[in-house]
Amino acid sequence: MAITKIHPIKSTLNLAISYIVNGEKTDEQILVSTHKCHQETAHTQFLRTRNDAGTNGTVLARHLIQSFLPGEASPEIAHQIGLELCKKILKDEYEFVLSTHIDKGHIHNHIIFNNVNMVTGKCYQSNKKSYHQIRYQSDKLCKENNLSDKTV
């Protein structure tokens, strides 16, 4: 099973996105996908959605990391699992940038998604319940793809 972590991004959103799409980490950006935004302008698109919704909380985005055991998944399978996780958790209602990093001993996904829902204008509620839902969906996708039941 993959390990998942999530934390808020309260500043330097552009730097966080630049880090996750770094070509040295993502096989020259082959392993980068976006939803309702473009990787170069995602930070401004996130802020535009936020402004349009009239939201002024401190959290700009959420950074979700999904790490796989060494050798457990190919970069392509890991990336596909990340896309499916986004679909299950974010339901096409949040802009996101997904990248799969292959530069470490283990493959891992970085998902940065807007804290503001494009449909409702409400902020993502990050709490134990939402984290357990992320974990549940990630574990389910790993099982569906015949990945290990061990954790990183």
Please provide the spans of the model-predicted regions.
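N-terminal nicking endonuclease/strand-transfer module with a His-rich metal-binding environment
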Residues: 1-152
